[in-house]
């Protein structure tokens, strides 16, 4: 079936296009091309037109009638299915209408969340191919999406349990925004910036929110003429922000994602060059590689690191263009990290490195595809100036190939490397494939390292296609194929599973790509061949040999895997998992080889496999299956020749062996008989037409063997029957050869070498289909009449009780029935019958769609409809068995299978289809060509895809009409699911779940039946039935969960039933399995529940589009437009639905309450019921009063679980009852009296100064309070003011406070009564101050919300009752009482937000003494809770309202009362409050700093640490971000200047600083130096604390402290050091990892140079360790500055000549590291310099006195000479994994110094020993670099005794 016609003028590679004037009247957007290749393709247009017309008409109707459910959902689901079956086969106009309609539906504000998700997923699919619709075709607004994201992802009520969203909702929404983004209007960018800029306050969580919104919403694909309305509005601002942030806050990674997207969408329109060094430095830092001698990682560097995927996209998009800067840096990046890829390295960072390797080539290939091969569309093309040139591609491949080759052998496996190589080989095969082969050939030879073999083979598989197709860049590629294949054969090894599997994959891959045809004869006939072609021709003579050797290997494998005798005895019919994988590998590889063979080679192979199979007798479990598979593969390739050999032989043997009738009744059959039956049953799985010749013989065999007594025998015979039926009735391709028409052509016409590696041509695929002929159908029915009919008659009589059958006979009959059913599933039409009506009311037709799958079901009434007959008989039999012999489980298992297949099976099983689809995708991925695209897959793969398309159609069953017959069978399954045997139940339940998913609305019919088993009033339910019913409710992991259908009608029944089932007599909590079931049920309901809608209103805009959709022509069905009556009726029904929903909701709540309040309900069920009730809290309805009362009473329940649920619930109820507060719009500029700034200035400006805390003007009187304009949210005004700035209106306009009981609503009265009752409150407080889990309890936000709600809704009504409790609790220092009072106080302070001034003032009169007491009673266990309490109290509150609190906390935090610990705690609590206030309290921060500064010399360690942390927060606001005004809060430079003044005494001293301070306050004045050391300790704590927290590091200021730290830091790792030294070391480690700005580099180097001249060798040593980390973590920033590189080089080389040995050695280590990461290069001046030093003459040895041990100070000459040797040694060690050209000579030079005095001799030995260690692995390779003489010297050195000395 070839699509002959192609539309004129279309690109021939784009299938589609109909000839001439379009018969369908529309041009499809983009069809699934594979449909055109199906054998029945000509029928599909009419079919799809009809379906599309129905969808448009009915979906339009449903929406106009406001019927979202069931009509709307039903037809949107149909649209999804349509999309899966035909692609986007609709006109552009319809496409736009569908999108607009779904967009409107998705954005209905009160839409139920599960519907929203359904619509959103469909909309995402419709928007997926953005090239199909341009911005002119479609425009979508952005605000509805923003409202939705805000409402759902930033929900204000979700945390209170008033809304339940599924976990998937975040991804769905983000993808939806991403899909709509290209279509946002041109002005969207400006509107978005206006909306979200005000959130950009870097100290606040809102910053994260702003950047998230920018990342997901900002459109970046606008055309160039609109760039001024797009990214140009924000690029400089955001990139400026990114460049200046130093400490990796969470949102930095999101900015990177945004820039990556921007860069990809606008290649060539943005100049990235100024940022390139910074980008690469940050990406390198993001890999978190371990560097330097001692490293401590900042934890947030790990958690907030960039996503490698996005970083890669960014790099790829910046490549190319005139400057080549990116390529230079990329090469630098790989140079610096290559050695980390070496297989000997491993760590948590390795995954990132591997991902980088895998993603980069992939990303470059995608870019090349887009620039060179992709069809142009409306999206902006890349300008020619910036397209990647061939040179760019070559440079890229060269810079990445080294690490990729190293990664082949990585510890994590070779997958990433193989994927990288696949993409690299597409671009530059000549650079990539040779080195891979160089590693592969030795790996194929090695016997000791099998992992090398698996790694190299999987990489060669990746490059196979590029290798075989050769092409002009790599013409010699194909010549490697045969040598590789021959060498791979030994890999078929029975003793090594993984080697075996990869070898199979390898051989299969290559043979798929190449016709195995011997072309050597062509050499004589033609003389126009190229050199390579001649070589290939002569090589192909080996193909036959290869095929035969492969077969011998397989035979060996089979013979070694024969079942051992021991296993033969047991009834294991299954192979082990590994055996079945080998079987699969073997059979698919062999079948691939035979498919690709020439006829000559095939005949030889056929004969060989035939001889092997008849000369042995195999057991049928393992070896037999493998041989039979090989035979089947042979027969499939050439049925005629093969069947001639096999069928007569097998039939003969079987007939011979069954001559004697005794055989029929034997329990154990002859092995030979079984083996031949097995063989025969497998070789009949071939083209049905070819089998017809042998039908008489085959039928005879069936007659002889179907009724054998031996189960193994008749099972094989049934297989034969099954395969005969399948072969004759199914539609399938009969060959998968790589070239259409096969290779059987004379060499003169056809030259196979031209077809090596050739892709299939979609247009001339020439699939050979097997379509059942009438003769075959007749034969199939003949088989059914002969073999199925008699069994059905027997079973029918057995079911009626007329015929006694033994169990074995029943099983045999059922086996025959089952095999007939699955053999002819395609022939038998689906079950027909009456539909089950009245399940759901709908005004739209809910009809099922019929798909044509290649067979007309015969109207021929003479033929029995066996599906219905089987159904009838099996149901009768089932009934009989369940009533009379329920323990016949084997028969029941089969009956379950039969029922499942009767319902669903039409020729293929879903799970098999899914796994084939998966493996199709894997093969596609492993061999696809992403560079050229255009579906250039090999032919076999394309055929497979068309076949999958056919199967997809046969499996499209969802949305089937639910008929009476289905109902009966599902009820049978339910009966089996609740029967006595657990295995029967389990199997029945799986089939039951599958059936429930297939039929529309059948769940509603079945639920009452399932719940029947749980009813407490039934006495006849057994425990097994009870358990079975619970499992039926629970569902399996993929299917429907009956307990939790998102539908009021259903959960109104199921939830109460689950709770009341606790009273059923079948329920027993003694049985752990039942307890576990209830736990699972409750857990699953909680996990899957999503808030169900109460309001199903459809917006006007939806209805308008729906009308257009219904009127849309081409295609359309004649359906009349809706009358106004219908529309009225629709509206009425929709209002009815809202009323019903509400009634159901209240019903459910009441029924659950009835259930929970039953007298003797076990506690477990009470808990489950309360849990379900708490799911029913909503934000659009207040809970019914009875439930409110229930929850409030349960605050004092005996069980803590219940109390916890009640606390959450009451907090939620209080939120429901919250009264709205009125807001007004203000103008901040008028209030401040300053005009609006002309450009953006963030931070402290005149127009936001009035928000600051100012003790001179805080509102202390009622008048001042009421005239103040309070702004509660801390971020407003920092960056910019919002367009519409709202604040709360004055007190008199707000809801009334101080209400009496009469003023309250009923719901409020319930709460009021309980909380005014002293007894109730006392009990509550007692419970709340109990300990829950010792040592694990923390401040509980739920309880805080409860109290906040109480004081917000009822202001101070309950204070009188609570006051005595608070006073009592505060005085009690127990952990749990303190925590309780902290929670209440936080709730009080936050709840008093809208109180009047008098009430607030009275509140603080009460609170201040309480807090003073509390802070003096603070303990180790509670300081965290008080910190949380104060932080929570200050969060999002105007600081001017809290002045009492701040003044209290600042009274004198370090009074010393209560000891140092209480001081530290007070500071902690204060810090919590101030940190929440961020930038709005500069005055308080200044006061605090002034107070702390004199106390920085505090002796106590805990206070010092706390002060350090407080300083971090004080200076947090001093940020160096762009467009930010200098801060009014304290600034670091001024502070540092004052500190340095005090540290002067330490700076001037040059010797080591020892820590002489004892940890106690000495008496009298301490000297300046001791004071200085104490100060220094605190400063260290401050610097360490701020390393991970602040946004920018004040480098200039810290630098002045560096020399001091260098002096203190210890050199060795020793934990016994005092705190000062440890801290100095840690602080240096953290500082060295800091990100530097380019202008800071010279400052740092200046300090390092100065310290390198210090007299303390500790300082000189530490300079080097600092340098190692600093350079690596700022690599490209330094490389970008030539002077800096020179300075560093000079610094390290000069320290090589230090008088102190340790410093010299560290300098050598540093040099070697800098060389290794390619920061410095080993050039000749350096080499000459070291060689000169080496030649320094040493002074003559003096005669020594016997008592004289040796020179203490080495002579200057010795130091110089040692420096030279160290330098050379550093060069050698800088290449641990290879041998550069200069190395052999250096090693020779070094060896000359083996006899020098110490420490030189030691250095040489160390160097040689390290060289040997690192180069030992690949010594064979490295040896090549040395001359013979050098090798002699070297071998001598490496093994000579002196080496071991």
UniProtKB/Swiss-Prot annotation:
| DNA repair recorded as keyword | yes
Stretches the record annotates as Disordered: 1-26
Q: Where is the composition biased (Basic and acidic residues)?
A: 1-13
Tree of life domain? Eukaryota
Q: What is this protein called?
A: Proteasome activator complex subunit 4
> Which GO cellular component term is one of those annotated?
nucleus
Describe its partners and assembly state: Homodimer. Component of the spermatoproteasome, a form of the proteasome specifically found in testis. Interacts with the 20S and 26S proteasomes.
Q: What does this protein do?
A: Associated component of the proteasome that specifically recognizes acetylated histones and promotes ATP- and ubiquitin-independent degradation of core histones during spermatogenesis and DNA damage response. Recognizes and binds acetylated histones via its bromodomain-like (BRDL) region and activates the proteasome by opening the gated channel for substrate entry. Binds to the core proteasome via its C-terminus, which occupies the same binding sites as the proteasomal ATPases, opening the closed structure of the proteasome via an active gating mechanism.
Cell compartments where the protein resides: Cytoplasm, Cytosol; Nucleus; Nucleus speckle
- Annotated domain remarks: The bromodomain-like (BRDL) region specifically recognizes and binds acetylated histones.
**Record's family?**
Belongs to the BLM10 family.
Q: What is its main location?
A: cytoplasm
Record PTM Phosphoserine, positions in chain: 1123, 1616
* Cytoplasm recorded as keyword: yes
Record key words, sorted: Cytoplasm, Developmental protein, Differentiation, DNA damage, DNA repair, Nucleus, Phosphoprotein, Proteasome, Repeat, Spermatogenesis
The alphabetized list of GO BP terms reads: DNA damage response; DNA repair; proteasomal ubiquitin-independent protein catabolic process; sperm DNA condensation
Region annotation (Bromodomain-like (BRDL)) ranges: 1652-1740
Q: Where are the HEAT repeats?
A: 475-519, 1000-1039, 1181-1219, 1356-1394, 1638-1676, 1682-1720
Which post-translational modifications are recorded for this protein?
Answer: Phosphorylated.
A Pfam family that this protein carries is HEAT_PSME4
Recorded GO terms, molecular function?
lysine-acetylated histone binding; peptidase activator activity; proteasome binding
Q: Which PANTHER family match?
A: PROTEASOME ACTIVATOR COMPLEX SUBUNIT 4
């Amino acid at each position: 079936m070839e699509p002959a016609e192609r539309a004129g003028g279309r690109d021939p590679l784009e299938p589609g296009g109909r000839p001439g004037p379009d018969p369908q009247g529309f041009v499809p957007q983009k069809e699934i091309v594979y449909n055109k290749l199906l054998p029945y393709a000509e029928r599909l247009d009419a079919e799809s037109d009809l379906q599309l017309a129905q969808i448009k008409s009915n979906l339009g109707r449903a929406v106009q009638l406001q019927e979202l459910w069931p009509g709307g959902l039903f037809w949107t689901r149909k649209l999804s299915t349509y999309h899966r079956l035909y692609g986007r086969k609709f006109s552009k106009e319809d496409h736009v209408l569908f999108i607009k309609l779904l967009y409107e539906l998705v954005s209905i504000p009160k839409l139920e969340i599960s519907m929203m998700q359904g619509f959103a997923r469909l909309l995402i699919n419709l928007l997926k191919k953005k090239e199909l619709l341009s911005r002119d075709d479609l425009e979508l607004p952005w605000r509805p999406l923003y409202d939705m994201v805000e409402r759902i992802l930033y929900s204000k009520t979700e945390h209170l349990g008033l809304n339940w969203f599924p976990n998937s909702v975040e991804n769905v929404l983000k993808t939806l925004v991403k899909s709509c983004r290209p279509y946002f209007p041109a002005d969207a960018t400006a509107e978005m910036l206006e909306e979200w800029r005000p959130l950009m306050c870097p100290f606040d969580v809102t910053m994260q929110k702003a950047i998230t919104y920018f990342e997901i919403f900002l459109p970046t694909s606008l055309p160039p003429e609109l760039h001024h309305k797009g990214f140009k509005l924000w690029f400089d601002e955001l990139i400026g922000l990114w460049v200046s942030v130093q400490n990796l806050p969470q949102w930095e990674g999101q900015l990177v994602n945004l820039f990556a997207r921007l860069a990809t969408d606008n290649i060539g329109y943005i100049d990235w060059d100024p940022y390139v060094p910074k980008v690469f430095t940050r990406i390198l830092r993001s890999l978190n590689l371990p560097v330097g001698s001692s490293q401590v990682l900042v934890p947030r560097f790990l958690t907030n690191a960039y996503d490698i995927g996005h970083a890669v996209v960014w790099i790829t998009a910046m490549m190319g263009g005139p400057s080549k800067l990116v390529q230079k840096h990329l090469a630098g990046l790989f140079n610096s990290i290559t050695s980390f890829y070496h297989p000997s390295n491993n760590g948590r960072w390795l995954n990132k490195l591997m991902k980088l390797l895998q993603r980069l080539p992939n990303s470059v290939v995608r870019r090349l595809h887009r620039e060179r091969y992709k069809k142009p569309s409306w999206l902006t093309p890349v300008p020619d100036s910036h397209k990647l040139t061939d040179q760019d591609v070559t440079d890229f491949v060269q810079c990445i190939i080294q690490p990729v080759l190293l990664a082949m052998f990585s510890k994590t496996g070779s997958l990433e490397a193989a994927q990288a190589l696949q993409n690299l080989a597409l671009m530059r095969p000549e650079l990539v494939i040779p080195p891979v082969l160089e590693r592969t050939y030795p790996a194929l030879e090695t016997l000791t390292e099998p992992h090398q073999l698996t790694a190299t083979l999987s990489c060669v598989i990746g490059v196979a296609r590029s290798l075989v197709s050769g092409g002009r860049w790599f013409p010699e590629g194909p010549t490697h194929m045969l040598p590789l294949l021959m060498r791979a054969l030994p890999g078929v090894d029975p003793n090594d599973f993984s080697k075996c599997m990869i070898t199979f994959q390898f051989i299969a891959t290559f043979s798929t790509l190449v016709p195995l045809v011997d072309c050597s004869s062509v050499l004589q006939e033609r003389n126009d061949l190229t050199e390579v072609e001649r070589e290939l021709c002569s090589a192909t003579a080996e193909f036959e040999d290869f095929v035969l050797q492969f077969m011998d290997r397989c035979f060996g494998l089979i013979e070694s895997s024969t079942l051992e005798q021991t296993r033969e005895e047991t009834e294991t019919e299954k192979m082990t998992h590994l055996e079945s994988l080998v079987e699969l590998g073997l059979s698919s590889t062999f079948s691939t080889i035979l498919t690709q063979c020439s006829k000559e080679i095939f005949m030889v192979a056929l004969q060989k496999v035939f001889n092997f199979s008849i000369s042995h007798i195999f057991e049928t479990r393992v070896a037999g299956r493998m041989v039979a598979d090989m035979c089947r593969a042979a027969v499939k390739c050439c049925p005629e020749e093969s069947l001639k050999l096999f069928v007569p032989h097998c039939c003969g043997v079987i007939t011979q062996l069954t001559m004697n009738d005794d055989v029929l009744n034997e329990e154990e059959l002859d092995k030979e008989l079984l083996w031949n039956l097995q063989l025969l049953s497998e070789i009949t799985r071939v083209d049905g037409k070819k089998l017809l010749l042998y039908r008489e013989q085959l039928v005879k065999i069936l007659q002889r063997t179907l009724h054998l007594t031996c189960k193994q025998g008749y099972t094989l015979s049934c297989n034969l029957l099954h395969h005969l039926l399948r072969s004759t009735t199914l539609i399938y391709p009969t060959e998968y050869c790589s070239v259409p028409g096969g290779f059987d052509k004379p060499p003169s016409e056809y030259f196979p070498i031209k077809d090596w590696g050739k892709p299939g041509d979609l247009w001339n695929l020439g699939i050979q289909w097997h379509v059942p002929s009438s003769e075959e159908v007749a034969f199939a029915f003949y088989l059914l009449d002969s073999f199925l009919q008699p069994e059905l008659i027997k079973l029918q009589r057995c079911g009626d009780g007329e015929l006694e059958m033994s169990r074995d006979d029943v099983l045999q009959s059922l086996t025959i029935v089952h095999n007939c059913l699955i053999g002819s599933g395609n022939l038998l039409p689906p079950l027909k019958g009456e539909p089950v009506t009245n399940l759901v009311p709908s005004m739209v037709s809910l009809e099922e769609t019929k798909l044509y799958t290649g067979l007309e079901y015969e109207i021929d009434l003479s033929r029995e409809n066996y599906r219905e007959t089987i159904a009838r008989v099996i149901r009768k039999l089932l009934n009989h068995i369940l009533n009379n012999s329920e323990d016949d489980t084997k028969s029941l298992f089969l009956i379950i299978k039969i029922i499942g297949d009767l319902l669903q099976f039409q020729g293929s099983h879903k799970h098999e289809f899914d796994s084939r689809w998966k493996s199709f995708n894997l093969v596609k991925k492993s061999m696809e060509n992403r560079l050229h695209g255009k579906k250039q897959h090999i032919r076999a793969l394309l055929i497979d895809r068309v076949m999958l398309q056919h199967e997809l159609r046969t499996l499209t069953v969802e949305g089937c009409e639910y008929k009476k017959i289905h109902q009966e069978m599902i009820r049978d399954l339910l009966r089996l699911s609740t029967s006595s045997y657990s295995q029967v139940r389990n199997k029945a339940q799986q089939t039951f779940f599958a059936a429930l998913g297939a039929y529309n609305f059948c769940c509603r019919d079945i639920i009452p039946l399932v719940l029947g088993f749980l009813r407490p009033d039934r006495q006849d339910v057994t425990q097994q039935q009870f358990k079975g019913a619970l499992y039926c409710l629970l569902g399996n992991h993929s299917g429907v969960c009956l307990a939790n259908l998102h539908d009021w009608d259903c959960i109104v029944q199921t939830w109460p039933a689950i709770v009341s089932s606790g009273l059923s007599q079948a329920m027993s909590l003694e049985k752990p399995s039942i307890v576990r079931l209830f736990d699972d049920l409750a857990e699953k309901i909680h996990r899957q529940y999503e808030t169900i809608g109460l309001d199903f209103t459809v917006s006007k805009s939806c209805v308008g589009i729906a009308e257009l959709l219904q009127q849309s022509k081409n295609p359309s069905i004649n359906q009349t437009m809706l009358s106004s009556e219908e529309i009225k009726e629709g509206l009425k029904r929709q209002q009815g639905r809202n009323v019903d929903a509400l009634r159901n909701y209240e019903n459910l709540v009441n029924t659950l309450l009835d259930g929970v309040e039953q007298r003797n309900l076990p506690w477990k069920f009470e808990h489950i019921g309360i849990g379900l009730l708490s799911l029913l809290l909503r934000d659009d309805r207040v809970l019914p009063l009875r439930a409110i009362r229930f929850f409030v009473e349960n605050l004092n329940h005996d069980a803590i679980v219940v109390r916890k649920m009640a606390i959450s619930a009451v907090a939620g109820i209080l939120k429901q009852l919250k009264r709205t507060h009125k807001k007004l719009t203000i103008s901040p500029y008028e209030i401040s009296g300053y005009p609006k700034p002309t450009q953006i200035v963030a931070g402290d400006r005149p127009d936001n100064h009035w928000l600051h805390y100012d003790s001179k003007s805080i509102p202390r009187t009622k008048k001042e309070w009421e005239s103040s304009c309070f702004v509660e949210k801390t971020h407003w005004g920092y960056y910019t003011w919002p367009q519409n700035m709202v604040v709360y209106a004055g007190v008199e306009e707000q809801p009334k406070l101080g209400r009496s009981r009469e003023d309250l609503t009923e719901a409020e009265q319930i709460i009021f009564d309980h909380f005014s009752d002293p007894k109730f409150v006392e009990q509550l407080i007692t419970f709340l101050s109990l300990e829950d889990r010792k040592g694990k309890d923390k401040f509980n936000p739920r309880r805080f919300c409860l109290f906040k709600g109480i004081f917000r809704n009822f202001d101070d009504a309950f204070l009188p009752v609570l006051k005595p409790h608070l006073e009592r609790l505060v005085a009690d220092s127990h952990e749990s009482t303190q925590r309780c009072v902290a929670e209440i106080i936080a709730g009080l302070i936050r709840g008093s937000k809208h109180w009047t001034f008098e009430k607030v003032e009275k509140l603080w009169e009460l609170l201040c003494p309480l807090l003073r007491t509390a802070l003096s009673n603070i303990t180790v266990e509670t300081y965290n809770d008080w910190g949380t309490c104060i932080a929570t109290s200050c969060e999002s509150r105007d600081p001017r309202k809290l002045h009492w609190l701040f003044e209290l906390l600042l009274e004198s935090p370090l009074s010393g009362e209560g000891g140092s610990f209480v001081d530290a705690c007070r500071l902690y609590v204060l810090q919590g409050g101030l940190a929440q206030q961020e930038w709005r309290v500069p005055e308080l921060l200044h006061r605090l700093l002034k107070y702390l500064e004199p106390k920085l010399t505090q002796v106590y360690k805990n206070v010092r640490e706390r002060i350090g942390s407080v300083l971090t927060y004080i200076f947090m606001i001093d940020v160096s971000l762009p467009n930010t005004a200098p801060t009014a809060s304290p600034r670091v430079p001024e502070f540092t200047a004052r500190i340095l003044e005090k540290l002067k005494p330490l700076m001037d001293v040059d010797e080591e600083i020892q820590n002489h301070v004892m940890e106690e306050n000495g008496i009298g004045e301490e000297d300046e130096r001791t004071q200085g050391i104490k100060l220094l300790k605190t400063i260290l704590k401050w610097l360490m604390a701020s390393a991970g927290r602040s946004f920018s590091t004040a480098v200039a200021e810290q630098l002045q402290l560096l020399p001091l730290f260098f002096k203190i830091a210890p050199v060795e790792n020793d934990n016994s050091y005092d705190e000062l030294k440890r801290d100095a070391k840690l602080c240096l480690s953290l500082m060295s990892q800091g990100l530097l700005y380019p202008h800071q580099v010279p400052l740092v180097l200046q300090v390092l140079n100065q310290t390198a001249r210090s007299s303390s060798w500790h300082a000189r040593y530490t300079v080097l360790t600092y340098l190692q980390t600093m350079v690596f973590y700022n690599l490209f920033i330094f490389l970008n500055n030539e002077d800096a590189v020179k300075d560093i080089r000079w610094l390290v080389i000069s320290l090589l000549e230090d008088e102190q040995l340790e410093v010299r050695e560290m300098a050598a280590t540093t040099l070697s590291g800098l060389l290794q990461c390619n920061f410095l290069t080993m050039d000749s001046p350096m080499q000459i310099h070291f060689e000169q030093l080496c030649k320094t003459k040493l002074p003559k040895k003096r005669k020594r006195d016997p008592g004289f041990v040796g020179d203490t100070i080495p002579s200057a000459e010795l130091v110089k000479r040692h420096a030279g040797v160290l330098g050379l040694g550093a060069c050698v060690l800088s290449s641990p994994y290879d041998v550069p050209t200069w190395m052999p000579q250096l090693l020779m030079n070094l060896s000359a110094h083996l006899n020098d005095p110490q420490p030189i001799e030691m250095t040489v030995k160390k160097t040689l020993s390290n060289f040997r260690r690192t180069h030992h692995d690949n010594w064979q390779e490295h040896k090549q670099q040395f001359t013979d003489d050098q090798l002699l010297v070297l071998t001598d050195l490496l093994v000579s005794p002196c080496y071991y000395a």
